Swiss-Prot record:
Gene3D superfamilies: Hexapeptide repeat proteins, Spore Coat Polysaccharide Biosynthesis Protein SpsA, Chain A. This is Mannose-1-phosphate guanylyltransferase regulatory subunit alpha. One of its GO terms (molecular function) is transferase activity. Residues 2-251 are annotated as: Substrate-binding domain. GDP-alpha-D-mannose binds at E85, Q247. The lineage of its organism: Eukaryota, Metazoa, Chordata, Craniata, Vertebrata. It comes from Sus scrofa. Residues 356-384 are annotated as: C-loop. The gene is GMPPA. Pfam families: GMPPB_C, NTP_transferase. InterPro entries: GMPPB_C (IPR056729), Hexapep_transf_CS (IPR018357), Mannose-1P_guanyltransferase (IPR050486), NTP_transferase_dom (IPR005835), Nucleotide-diphossugar_trans (IPR029044).
Length: 420
């Protein structure tokens, strides 16, 4: 018997995802046509012996989250429950707080997945490795180049046994080119060391600032507190993957993750990819079109385009490397490149909405998406263009490398600006 835990965080996280996270919780943002965490749930549901999936976070159980959970339970025929933290408890604190629910039924092991990662989720391979050599902690790792490794948790392993000898979260100097993917397989006994850390922090009064509202509530961070302390003690091991993987921290990384998942659909869900049909729009590359969307036959879509529910795409529209969300309208002959068009937004005819991609170096197989700051030297860096929900773009204007907050009605062109 197996279980899975998906750590979805809370509204105090995901600030780099704004303005998209204003409308829906970040874990429910559509990536390649389905909510971000549905990719996680699909992967977990395919593991033989999976009995229950638990979501742990600090979001209020509002209507979108409740509706998603009900639909997911029906689709995957698995119990899927949301466990709300009383305060933000960190990646390890939530596991310890809900340890009784996780261990109920006596699971052999349980997966722990961070919600803000994109991956092909090699969970069965991790389970095989765990059963071959059972250990308390098994981490999924991948490789990064020397420069980018500093932005992740770095793992020094024993090449023969794959034991984690040393772990450093976001080191200041190069430690290792093996990085933590944020996907784990834990044995039930892992909750004992979490309890020791919890008690130690309680006794020492070492509480995170986020827990001050609840005196006595301990925050435990798996990466900084647990992995760093237990590395080299024969408890933590790493399973390396060369499959797809990326963090989803910013809106730009969501667009890149959508591209990765759309490419995966060729193997996993070919039925989700649009096909070129007589009288239909021209499809180039991997494109997802929701069944309720209305797309004019003269539109040209792709590659790497995701069109959401109820979207209207007019005659002569050109769409490339973009996400168009629920209820948006692209009027005749608009051009949308490297952009995200928000819920219910309208782009006027002959308008152009364009961004600048910040993709990994295609010549470096170990390169990953950078989650850089929006600004450098007081100037907005060129990035993808984001239209918040219910934005109105007039006809014949250019919106380039800009972020438009929700409910704005523009009257002219903008370049390299945040429109509040």
């Amino acid at each position: 018997m197996l279980k899975a835990v998906i750590l979805i965080g809370g509204p105090q996280k995901g600030t780099r995802f704004r303005p998209l996270s204003f409308e829906v919780p970040k874990p429910l943002f559509p990536v390649a046509g389905v909510p971000m965490i549905q990719h996680h749930i699909e992967a977990c549901a395919q593991v033989p012996g999976m009995q229950e999936i638990l979501l742990i976070g600090f979001y209020q159980p509002d209507e979108p989250l409740t509706r998603f959970l009900e639909a997911a339970q029906q689709e995957f025929n698995l119990p899927i429950r949301y466990l709300q933290e009383f305060a933000p408890l960190g990646t390890g604190g939530g596991l310890y707080h809900f340890r009784d629910q996780i261990l109920a039924g006596g699971p052999e092991a349980f997966f722990v997945l961070n919600a803000d990662v994109c991956s092909d989720f090699p969970l069965s391979a991790m389970l095989d490795a765990h059963r071959h050599r059972p250990h308390p902690f098994l981490l999924l790792g991948t490789t990064a180049n020397r420069t980018q490794s500093l932005n992740y948790g770095c793992i020094v392993e024993n090449p023969q046994t794959h034991e984690v000898l040393h772990y450093v979260e976001k080191p200041s100097t190069f430690v290792s080119d093996i990085i933590n993917c944020g996907i784990y397989l834990f044995s039930p006994e892992t909750l004992k060391p979490l309890g020791k850390f919890f008690q130690r922090y309680q006794q020492g009064g070492q509480l995170e600032d986020s827990s001050v509202l609840w005196p006595g509530a301990g925050t435990i961070r798996l990466e900084q507190d647990v992995f760093a302390a237990l590395a080299g003690q024969g408890q933590i091991y790493v399973h390396l993957t060369d499959g797809i993987w990326s963090q989803i921290k910013s809106a730009g990384s969501a667009l890149y993750a959508s591209r990765l998942y759309l490419s995966q659909y060729q193997l996993t869900h070919p039925e989700r990819l649009a096909k070129h049909t007589p009288g239909g729009p021209r499809i180039r590359g991997n494109v997802y079109i929701h069944p309720t969307a209305k797309v004019a036959p003269s539109a040209v879509l792709g590659p790497n385009v995701s069109i959401g529910e109820g979207v209207t795409v007019g005659e002569g529209v050109r769409l490339r490397e973009s996400i168009v969300l629920h209820g948006a309208t692209l009027q005749e002959h608009t051009c949308v490149l490297h952009s995200i068009v928000g819920w219910g937004s309208t782009v006027g005819r002959w308008a152009r909405v364009e961004g600048t991609p910040n993709d990994p170096n295609p010549n470096d197989p170990r390169a990953h998406m950078d989650s850089e700051s929006l600004f450098k030297d007081g100037k907005l860096l060129p990035a993808i263009t984001i239209l918040g929900c219910r934005v109105r773009i007039p006809a014949e204007v250019l919106i380039l490398n800009s972020i438009v907050l929700p409910h704005k009605e523009l009257s002219r062109s903008f370049t390299n600006q945040i429109i509040l």
